Each structure stands twice: as structure tokens, then as C-alpha cells.
Amino acid sequence: MKYLFLSLFVLLSSCKEKSLSPIGQEYVLVNKEVPMEITLGFNPDGRFYGKAVNDYWGLYHIHDNVISFSGITSTMKADILPRMRVERKYFDSLTNGHTFEMKEDHLKIFFDETGILEFKIKKESNTIPL
């Protein structure tokens, strides 16, 4: 009987849902109101990177479902004003990000009260092995 309970415990423990993580992946923003491609990738060493109008990078920290971005730095390319505004708003949203959620190949970052940045794994992504 002890063996049965032990076996059942081990079986149920191994069925625990695998925790999803954005680390080692590259995503593309899929928010419909964004008229340009914006990417976001996560290196295993705590650095993130991406491309909007400019290439950008910085540091991220994940604890449970909370994500924070710091030290956002970018190149200094110029573009038409509406695209520059979209990029600035995107950077501000990343800075204000608080929680995230992952489902299959989607990543959602929630910021402020009602804002959501929604990403999908980039198909031609050169994912970084963990």
C-alpha cells in the first residue's frame, strides 16, 4: 500500500505543468495598432535586445510572473515622426511593464492599468539554447 501511494505521489508530481519562460526566445509585437515591426529577444544572461526604428538593448529581471526592464539604450537612427512616436511609446511601455503571461508561442506584457504588449515567437527566430 505504501508503494502504491508513493508511486501515485511521484506520478502526480511529474505531471506538474512546465513553467514557460521567454528566456532564449525572440518575439515580434503583434498589437494591431502598431504600424511597424518591433522585435524583442531575451538572452539567458539577463540582457534583452530588439529592433524598432532603432536597435535597442538593456537588462531585464524576471521573478515569478513579474518582469522589469532597465537601462534601455538604442541607436540614434531617425525616421518619420509617427514611427518615432510609436517607438518612444513602446520604450515607455517596456519601462512600465509589471507582469507577464505566456501561452504557447505568445508573450503578453501588462503595463500601467490597462496596457498590453502582445508578442508572438518570431518564426525565423534564431532562438538561443538554454
Labelled PLM ranges:
Residues 3-13:
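Sec-dependent N-terminal signal peptides
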Residues 13-130:
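Lipid interaction determinants
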